[in-house]
């Protein structure tokens, strides 16, 4: 009997020791391997090579994914050309040299080539515009030039579009949003005349664009004010201006009209006057009823310092 009691006591001590052991009381930990290395090769999906763009679009639509349509196109304008074709090269100083000199002979030969090309272009223009002549067109071109600049000073963009091409319009109005332009035509020093006519084909055969270069020598007044009313450039005194203005028309268009297309600036032309920019200087804030001259600025005198050597 005593032996059995000892045996039960020993078994109970062993069971209690096994339950209270630190290895038994520790929480179970699950160790999982983590991939830290970047995979530079991703195996392709099964059957990805056999899929076409149409199959992928159909699959996306079936899944309810709507992909926006991307158009790789940009609008173009065919009412006018993108530049001046075969621009006229004015002689230096706009003076005729003697035909006996080497430079004068070269200038005369160049003029004959340009005249022959202009005569061929005039024939093409008259096929679509029977009223076109080199005698009456310069006066019409000068009227377009004067009216377009009047609309520019008033910034009437709707009427300005009818007199200038889509290529010339941004060049005329760029930077004039906060400026005031005062322009006037005084008089013509010389009668305007046609110096060159070109009528090339563009894009397709038979699609003709006519460009006529008109020489204008007149007196103008131009003065530009900034948004604060200060003069940026120009003056109210009339000045002699020599310009070569290009007018263009889409001959195939039955409703096309002659419009100003651009200007040719000779390489020997004098540089333009620099524009005086307005800057804001830090200073005392003025009231609406005060002027800058009414304020007395206190001049800070230098503080004397003692130098010890």
Swiss-Prot record:
GO MF annotation terms: structural constituent of ribosome
Main location: mitochondrion
GO CC terms in record: mitochondrial large ribosomal subunit; mitochondrion
InterPro entries: mtLSU_mL45 (IPR051975), NTF2-like_dom_sf (IPR032710), Tim44-like_dom (IPR007379)
Highest taxon of source: Eukaryota
Any one Gene Ontology BP term: mitochondrial translation
Keyword entries, A-Z: Mitochondrion, Ribonucleoprotein, Ribosomal protein, Transit peptide
Keyword Chaperone applies: no
Localization of this protein: Mitochondrion
Coiled coil: none
Family: Belongs to the mitochondrion-specific ribosomal protein mL45 family.
Functional note: Component of the mitochondrial large ribosomal subunit (mt-LSU). Within the mitochondrial ribosomes, required to direct the nascent polypeptide toward the tunnel exit and position the exit at a distance from the membrane surface.
Quaternary context: Component of the mitochondrial ribosome large subunit (39S) which comprises a 16S rRNA and about 50 distinct proteins.
Entry protein name: Large ribosomal subunit protein mL45
Species this chain originates from: Xenopus laevis (African clawed frog)
Gene (UniProt): mrpl45
């Amino acid at each position: 009997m005593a032996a059995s009691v000892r045996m039960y006591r020993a078994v109970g001590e062993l069971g209690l020791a096994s339950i209270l052991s630190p290895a038994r009381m520790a929480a179970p930990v699950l160790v999982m391997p983590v991939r830290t290395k970047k995979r530079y090769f991703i195996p392709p999906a099964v059957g990805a090579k056999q899929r076409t763009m149409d199959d992928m679009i159909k699959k996306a639509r079936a899944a309810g994914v709507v992909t926006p349509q991307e158009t790789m196109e940009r609008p173009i304008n065919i009412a006018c050309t993108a530049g001046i074709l075969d621009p006229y090269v004015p002689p230096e100083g706009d003076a005729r040299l003697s035909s006996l000199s080497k430079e004068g002979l070269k200038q005369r030969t160049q003029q004959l080539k340009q005249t022959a090309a202009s005569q061929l272009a005039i024939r093409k223009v008259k096929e679509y515009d029977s009223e076109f002549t080199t005698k009456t067109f310069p006066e019409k071109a000068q009227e377009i030039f004067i009216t377009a600049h009047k609309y520019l000073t008033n910034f009437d963009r709707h009427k300005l579009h009818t007199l200038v091409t889509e290529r010339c319009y941004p060049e005329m109005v760029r930077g004039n949003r906060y400026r005031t332009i005062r322009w006037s035509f005084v008089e013509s020093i010389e009668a305007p005349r046609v110096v060159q006519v070109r009528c090339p084909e563009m894009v397709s055969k038979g699609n003709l664009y006519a460009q006529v270069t008109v020489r204008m020598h007149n007196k103008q007044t131009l003065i530009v004010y900034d948004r604060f009313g200060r003069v940026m450039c120009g003056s109210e005194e009339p000045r002699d201006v020599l310009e070569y203005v290009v007018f263009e028309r889409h001959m195939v268009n039955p409703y096309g009209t002659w419009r100003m297309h651009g200007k040719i600036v000779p390489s020997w032309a004098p540089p333009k006057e620099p524009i005086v920019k307005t800057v804001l200087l830090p200073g005392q804030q003025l009231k609406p009823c005060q002027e800058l001259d009414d304020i007395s600025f206190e001049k800070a005198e230098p503080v004397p310092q003692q130098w010890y050597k």
